[in-house]
Amino acid sequence: MAQRLLLTDLLYSQGFGTRRICAGLVQQGLVQMDTGHGLVCVRETDTAVDVVQGMPFMVQGILWQYHTKAYVLLHKPAGTECSHKPSAWPSVYSLLPTPLRQRPAKTGLQGVQAVGRLDQDTTGMLLLSDDGQFIHRMSSPKHHVPKVYELETQDAMHASVVEKLLQGVVLNDDPQPVKAAACALTGSHSMALTLTEGKYHQVKRMLAAAGHKVVRLHRSQVGDMVLDHTLAPGQWRWLSGEELKALTRKTQS
C-alpha cells in the first residue's frame, strides 16, 4: 500500500541528512522522482509523493530505492571490523553508502546495524538492518537460526574431529558442551560447520578444543539464504522481499 510523504520527509527517512539538508538537495535540482513517465527532476520542497517499497528515485545522480526499513546483505571482506568504532581495522560500515549509515532512529543508534558480528579476518555473509526486531530474531540463540561456515585448518583433520564437534566440546568460559548443528569434512584441511548460536570466536574456539587451528573462516549461509557468488567482497545489495520473508519464516518456525 502506498504511503504519502512530503519529498523532504522521504529523503530524511532514507538517511540523506537533516530536513534542512534534504530541502537544499531538492531546491538545487539534485533529486529526481518517478512520476510514471520516468525519473523527473523535482525542485519544490512541498511536493507530496506516494511511496511504495522499492520505489526508485535519484539523488545527486545516484539511483536509490525507498524502504521503510533497510535490510541489506554485505559480503564482508577480510581485514574489517563489525564496529562503528574499530580498534585496528577499517569498519565494515565504511563500505556502505552514507545514507544507510545515517538513517534516522527513534531510539538507539542511527543507521543500519550488523546482525551479529564476524571477526576481522572472517569473510562472508553479513546482514545489516535498522529493524531492531529483525536483528533480535536473527541473532537470538532461542530462534536457532542456522549459520553455515566454511573453514580451513592448519593441520589435516580426521573423521574423529567431526564426531567431537557433533557430540559437543567444552569452551573455557562455559562448562556446558557446545555442539555443532551439522558438520562435514570437505577436504583434508577443510570443513563445513553449522551453528545455531553465536558465542565469541565460537568456531575458532570449538576447533581449538578439538585440537585444530583455523586459518581461514568464511560464512556462506544464514538460514536458507546462501551468499550470492556474484556479490564480490566489499559489495552490498538490498534483500529482496522473498529473501526477507524466507529469513523471517525461519525464525518463526
Q: What role is predicted for each listed range?
A:
Residues 1-87:
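S4-like RNA-binding module at protein N-termini
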Residues 15-16, 120, 196-200:
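Loop/turn elements at beta-strand to alpha-helix junctions within RNA-recognition modules
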Residues 36-52, 167-253:
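RNA substrate-recognition surfaces in RNA-acting enzymes
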Residues 61, 74-76, 128-131, 153-155, ...:
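Flexible glycine-/small-residue-rich
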Residues 77-80, 89, 98-101, 121, ...:
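Short, charged/polar surface micro-motifs in flexible loops or helix N-caps
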Residues 84-103, 162-169:
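A short, contiguous, amphipathic alpha-helix enriched in charged residues
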Residues 102-140:
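Glycine/acidic-rich beta-strand-loop module
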Residues 133-190, 206:
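Non-catalytic RNA-recognition surface used by pseudouridine synthases
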